[in-house]
Amino acid sequence: DDVTDLDERRKRGHGDPGGLHIIDQISIGMDTLQGRDPHVVTMGFDEHNGPLYPFTLQQKLDSITEPCSWYVADGDSPWGTPIVPTEMLSVLAHKHGPHLPVRRPSVGLFIDLEVRYVNGPVFVGRSYQLDHQVVGIGQSRRVESWWTETTLTDLETGLHAATVLLH
C-alpha cells in the first residue's frame, strides 16, 4: 500500500505519549470491542446512525454540497445499487459510539480522517462487520488523543470493503 501523510503523522505518535490522564487505560493494539461480539452495521436511507450522529443518510443527502446520482435509490450507480458517500463512512464506522475506557468528563474531537477503499465501494442497505483497533496514542499540551482503525467487511461477499482511520 502507498504511505499517506496521515500514516506518517500517526507513526510519529508511536513513541511514549507521556503522562496521560483521560485516556491512560487505552493502549496501542487494543481491540475496541474488548471481548464483545463484533458490530454489524448497515446504513439505510431512513435509519438513524447512533448516539454520535443523530441524523439519517437521507437527511445528509438532502443537504449534501456535492450530490451524486450514485447515492440515491433511483440513481444510476454502475453497481446497480446506491453507494454510501465517502464522507459518511466515518459515521457508519462509529455508528455504535465510543467503546473505550476514557475517563469522564471529556470532549470528543475528530482531528484527522482517512478512508481507504480496498474492495469498495460501501453499499446502502448492505451489512458490514466492523473491526476496530487502536493504532496510535498521543498528546499535545492540552489534548490527549488516539487513532482508531476500523475495517469494514462486507458480509455478503466476505471482502474487506474499506478502512476508516479516525484520529
Predicted regions located by residue number:
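Non-catalytic linker/capping segments at the edges of enzyme domains
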Residues: 2-82, 167
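Active-site helix/loop of acyl-thioester processing domains in fatty-acid/polyketide metabolism
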Residues: 62-110, 114-118
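Generic structural signal for short, flexible, solvent-exposed coil/loop and linker residues
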Residues: 22, 34, 44, 50, ...
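Generic alpha-helix detector with strongest preference for long hydrophobic helices that associate
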Residues: 45, 96, 113, 131-133
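HotDog/MaoC-like acyl-thioester-processing domains
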Residues: 1-32, 119-167
